[in-house]
Amino acid sequence: MQVMPPTPGGGPSRLFILRPVATTLFMIAILLAGIIGYRALPVSALPEVDYPTIQVVTLYPGASPDVVTSSITAPLERQFGQMSGLKQMASQSSGGASVITLQFQLTLPLDVAEQEVQAAINAATNLLPSDLPYPPIYNKVNPADPPILTLAVTATAIPMTQVEDMVETRIAQKISQVTGVGLVTLSGGQRPAVRVKLNAPAVAALGLDSETIRTAISNANVNSAKGSLDGPTRSVTLSANDQMKSAEEYRDLIIAYQNGAPIRLQDVATIEQGAENNKLAAWANTQSAIVLNIQRQPGVNVIATADSIREMLPELIKSLPKSVDVKVLTDRTSTIRASVNDVQFELLLAIALVVMVIYLFLRNAAATIIPSIAVPLSLVGTFAAMYFLGFSINNLTLMALTIATGFVVDDAIVVIENISRYIEKGEKPLDAALKGAGEIGFTIISLTFSLIAVLIPLLFMEDIVGRLFREFAVTLAVAILISAVVSLTLTPMMCARMLSYESLRKQNRLSRASEKFFDWVIAHYAVALKKVLNHPWLTLSVAFSTLVLTVILYLLIPKGFFPLQDNGLIQGTLEAPQSVSFSNMAERQQQVAAIILKDPAVESLTSFVGVDGTNATLNNGRLQINLKPLSERDDRIPQIITRLQESVSGVPGIKLYLQPVQDLTIDTQLSRTQYQFTLQATSLEELSTWVPKLVNELQQKAPFQDVTSDWQDQGLVAFVNVDRDSASRLGITMAAIDNALYNAFGQRLISTIYTQSNQYRVVLEHDVQATPGLAAFNDIRLTGIDGKGVPLSSIATIEERFGPLSINHLNQFPSATVSFNLAQGYSLGEAVAAVTLAEKEIQLPADITTRFQGSTLAFQAALGSTLWLIIAAIVAMYIVLGVLYESFIHPITILSTLPTAGVGALLALMLTGNELDVIAIIGIILLIGIVKKNAIMMIDFALAAERDQGMTPYDAIYQACLLRFRPILMTTLAALFGALPLMLSTGVGAELRQPLGVCMVGGLIVSQVLTLFTTPVIYLLFDKLARNTRGKNRHRDEDIDSSELLNGQEPQ
């Protein structure tokens, strides 16, 4: 089987060698295009891999979780469930709020999803409660995605209700208009309102009820059209004093007459300017504040969005009074920028190390400059392709370019080394360039396309992992392709004009010492190689052992999804007993905040309590902890989290759950801990039985810590058991009872005050401080059929029960989410296996289905495709090599080098305590492409020696190994030193980059040592096998010819 001979006279390089001006201008064009592309590229932490996600929030103050579920969530879910492209629908119905999160397929544009959601909301409108104060509101945002910016607004001389009003109208609305902003939430809930607190005994004494008062207030405050008068000469618009806008006006409102005397609202109630919801509060550190959390839309440029907000912020702050202070407490872009800057530094360091390696081997300044120019040209030129493909400058693309520094010089090194060999033999530089480039051209093409073939399977991966791989793979492939073009055009042209026999023979002390060292190494390698070739079966057993060891290590190594990053930001959830009151929860929250702020690694924090669209239950408080920069603290996030939890453990009755904020957010729900899986059943009763059992079982298992669930069914419920017969006899309907209860205890929004810039509400409630607890029910009065007051206690009894604080659905069925963190020293793979085992041990019924969520689900998908991905890469490379060599055998020889790389990578990961995760898998895929280069360079020269010089296979492969030892060692060290900065990185985001560097360095070291010996032995083995096969075929053909002659036939 013959390899295609090199094109005589320079091959594809001939035109570029003979036309230096055109070649130079061509390279300048590539460089300029890359510079322009670089300046236009956006910057982000990772490639945009967000699922199109929309959150629908519906507020219904005073409604229980049961009422919210049945009257709001269920009708909306039925409509949403009919949308095409919907991947998952999760809902959480709590007291006063319904939150539905819709996650769509990656291929569905977000704008199309938005249109479908709006249509579904419109279709469900007639099924929603008629007294719903606000329609369902949707936002193009993932609720689990942490805010890109957090602003804290505090004031000393102005009430927080006024501060909230100014922030909402002057800041929040303007920020919402910025391109890329998905949602601006105001935590703290101090929206201005007129609060009417009824004095229940006074209302009863005057023979009134709350419904009469509610109706009077609603009728007294209206803002409707009144028409206009159109006379002969002029037109007059009608207006009236039909609105009441302040608490003072409401105090004098006449709500009824008794014995001809007016009863004013202030006679039966306390009226004050207050907050619309007085069970919401937020703090910046320990100071009361309005906290603005700004979240991005899925798929937008974080840096550009944050920069736009920061540019407009000074002007917005100027519109506020001087006593109002606005601070940026969290800016996620600071760590993104720091991480990208660190990778850029590592890229420059990798370039410097690679150039140093080239100089040590070539020992000549001119010869070093030529391949060194290939690095900036290839890398900068790649930016142009990245721009046209819609990529960004992020950790993965910069990692690809860093790794590419070791790749892109390989081709140039091979070319210059071959040309230098002919110049040193005495040939003219131009002839040497034409001859050397023509001879090596096919090898360059083989190296390039076989390496790109490794990356092809990455392009066809689906889901989140596929999106992550794709940008990395394409960036690397483009850099490799440009480097091949440079090596076949610019490199030989420069060799013809910059190299000479004298310059190559000119040596200094360093070059002479390195020359002696390399000669010594090659001499010893030659001796060792002869011994190995004379004992092939021992070498083959070593090669087979590496294959077996690779499989064993793959099975044993801990497996994860994505490295845990230290971005300097921690999300926390504080959990208190399910029956805790708002004031008690706020007090506990402040206790915890004070403890956390004492930690030396903590810079600031924001926290809030209360039920809104982001927090489901009153017994949960949310915290966002900002850490000091890495340079100002000694510990990483895992140690800080452990320390904070230990510090807070002394506060009675609370549990603190913490998790580090990550750049990659796949989850759709904001959970207490990092990993989640759900249990889904047909009824809440089944979940109430099995969720606690499973949580208890997991708490006993080693891989887990902070195991918890969102199943909370021990909230106190005051059940009003109405005697329907008695109520009917008195002419009291259930609607009247519900209205009376809602008026008393629901912070009912009964009227709207319209102004030029905003709308405010009138809130009705009983003054429960006068009669706290269940005794407040004794003050409820209803009006019977005879017009007389009827105490609620005469027709109903109050029973204390337990009930759910929230009701969760997944794809319209009741569900509960169990969440956990990993214990120190355990991997996500071990945790997944432990969950499966726990389900079997507690004998979970078949009608309760479990499913991992978020990053755990993505981990399972990635784990399932990893092996097939590696196999696909090997098959793709075999096909390309088979086509290039027109051989079935030689590609197998080349691919036999791969197990050595796998052993080195897996051993390096285990020794450094890293998991086999997505980033490490990228490293292994790249090793498959790099390591086979050694075999290609050996086999190309061996085949050429057999064909052109008539050498035996033994002599040919022996000479090829010695002749190619120097370029093999040079290219391997270039790739190794290119990966070294990633392995040794310590800055922001280093956790993301280290596994790739560790894989590359470990794999290259082991494979370099082994493939120099195993490849020639396997080459001879397959050559012998091929010759034996050809011999048998020849004997068979001769036998056929003989039989034809005996039968009197001419041979065919």
Swiss-Prot record:
Residues 1032-1052 are annotated as: Disordered. Disulfide bonds: none annotated. It is a multi-pass membrane protein. It is found in: Cell inner membrane. The keyword Iron-sulfur does not apply. One of its GO terms (cellular component) is plasma membrane. Keywords: Cell inner membrane, Cell membrane, Membrane, Transmembrane, Transmembrane helix, Transport. Gene3D superfamilies: Multidrug efflux transporter AcrB pore domain, Multidrug efflux transporter AcrB pore domain like, Multidrug efflux transporter AcrB TolC docking domain, DN and DC subdomains, Multidrug efflux transporter AcrB transmembrane domain. GO terms for molecular function: xenobiotic transmembrane transporter activity. Its main location: membrane. It holds the Pfam family ACR_tran. The chain crosses the membrane at residues 16-36, 342-362, 373-393, 396-416, 440-460, 472-492, 537-557, 863-883, 888-908, 911-931, 968-988, 1002-1022. HAMAP family: MdtB. Belongs to the resistance-nodulation-cell division (RND) (TC 2.A.6) family. MdtB subfamily. Part of a tripartite efflux system composed of MdtA, MdtB and MdtC. MdtB forms a heteromultimer with MdtC. This is Multidrug resistance protein MdtB.
